[in-house]
């Protein structure tokens, strides 16, 4: 097989770099971890007390196996790892030199839930503080999708997920960027765009509720209140299913506002006719 197709595997182990290979002008540009620098420049207390005897012992151990390797480069980091029985010196450092370990990004938990988590899922073990949150989570394990998309037939367990998906078909993007006029289907996408692209930091606290935006799913109209949305849908889309889902109390309240507004308009028109 030609050498072009041969792939050389890199060793996963951490290789110890010899400082003797670098010239003096390049040693200043080499990165040295802080923890390793302390071990290199601050020898243990027992080494300080010996004084010149440490150098003599280093030369005498050159004949022993491994002695020449340790005395060849005083600045070379040791590849030994601390044993469980190693003791700490007075300055808090281990008596034996150790290889610097990279900080892991994996978070380890004790496996115990707090007292606030009282409702847990029997299928996956996830915990929730409220029963309604658990009920909503259980829908994701249900194989039957109750809410279907009328455009492509894809099923969802939640109406919110269905609404978010339908906007990809209708092209309704109610959340617009004030800087570049780019529009998004979700508020979180707009906030992420402002932070990453324009560097705009949001002025709300963690988990603080934002001002809700009421969106007409038929034409993309946005209103600050549900009443404004109801008035718009009632006038522009009388046959919309949104009117059927609206509560009777809100419908009666808004219907009274509609009649009062209609009466005001008729009274103004009558006054204009009299003039």
From Swiss-Prot:
Gene Ontology biological-process annotations: angiogenesis; cell population proliferation; dorsal/ventral pattern formation; embryonic digestive tract morphogenesis; endocardium formation; epidermal cell differentiation; heart looping; heart trabecula formation
Pfam families assigned: zf-C2H2, zf-C2H2_4, zf-C2H2_6
Tissue spec: Expressed in testis, ovary, heart and skeletal muscle. Expressed in the cornea, but absent from the corneal endothelium.
Zn-finger region bounds: C2H2-type: 119-141, 147-169, 175-198, 214-237
Skewed-composition ranges (Acidic residues): 80-89
Modified residues annotated as Phosphoserine in this record: 269
Alphabetized UniProt keyword annotations: Corneal dystrophy, Developmental protein, DNA-binding, Metal-binding, Nucleus, Phosphoprotein, Repeat, Transcription, Transcription regulation, Zinc, Zinc-finger
GO molecular function: chromatin binding; DNA-binding transcription activator activity, RNA polymerase II-specific; DNA-binding transcription factor activity, RNA polymerase II-specific; DNA-binding transcription repressor activity, RNA polymerase II-specific; RNA polymerase II cis-regulatory region sequence-specific DNA binding; sequence-specific double-stranded DNA binding; transcription cis-regulatory region binding; zinc ion binding
Position of the signal peptide: none
Region (Disordered): 15-101
Protein's cellular compartments: Nucleus
InterPro entries tied to this protein: Ovo-like, Znf_C2H2_sf, Znf_C2H2_type
Assembly information from the UniProt record: Interacts (via zinc-finger domains) with CEBPA (via bZIP domain); the interaction inhibits the transcription factor activity of CEBPA and is required to repress adipogenesis.
PANTHER family, A to Z: TRANSCRIPTION FACTOR OVO-LIKE 2, ZINC FINGER PROTEIN WITH KRAB AND SCAN DOMAINS
Family (UniProt): Belongs to the krueppel C2H2-type zinc-finger protein family.
Clinical condition linked: Corneal dystrophy, posterior polymorphous, 1: A rare corneal disorder characterized by small aggregates of apparent vesicles bordered by a gray haze at the level of Descemet membrane, an altered corneal endothelial cell structure, and an unusual proliferation of endothelial cells. Symptoms can range from very aggressive to asymptomatic and non-progressive, even within the same family.
Protein's recorded name: Transcription factor Ovo-like 2
Organism in which the protein naturally occurs: Homo sapiens
């Amino acid at each position: 097989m030609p050498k072009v197709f041969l792939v050389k595997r890199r060793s996963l182990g951490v290789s110890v770099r010899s400082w003797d290979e670098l010239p003096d002008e390049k040693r200043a540009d080499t990165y040295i971890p802080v923890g390793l620098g302390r071990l290199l420049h601050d020898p243990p207390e027992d080494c300080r007390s010996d004084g010149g005897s440490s150098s003599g012992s280093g030369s005498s151990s050159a004949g022993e196996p491994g002695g020449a390797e340790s005395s060849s480069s005083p600045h070379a980091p040791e590849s030994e790892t601390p044993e469980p029985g190693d003791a700490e010196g007075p300055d808090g450092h281990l008596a034996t030199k150790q290889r610097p370990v990279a900080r892991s990004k994996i978070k380890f938990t004790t496996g115990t839930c707090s007292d606030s988590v009282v409702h847990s899922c029997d299928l996956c073990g996830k915990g929730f503080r409220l029963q309604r949150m658990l009920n909503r989570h259980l829908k994701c394990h249900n194989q039957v999708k109750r809410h279907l998309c009328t455009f492509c037939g894809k099923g969802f367990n939640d109406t919110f997920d269905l609404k978010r998906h339908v906007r990809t078909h209708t092209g309704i993007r109610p959340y617009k960027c004030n800087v570049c006029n780019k529009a998004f289907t979700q508020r979180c996408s707009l906030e992420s765009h402002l932070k990453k692209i324009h560097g705009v930091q949001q002025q709300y606290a963690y988990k603080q509720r934002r001002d809700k935006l009421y969106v007409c799913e038929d034409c993309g109209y946005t209103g600050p209140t549900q009443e404004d949305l109801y008035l718009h849908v009632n006038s522009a889309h009388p046959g919309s299913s949104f009117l059927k889902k609206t509560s009777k109390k809100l419908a009666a309240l808004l219907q009274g506002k509609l009649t009062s507004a209609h009466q005001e308009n008729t009274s103004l028109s009558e006054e204009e006719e009299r003039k």
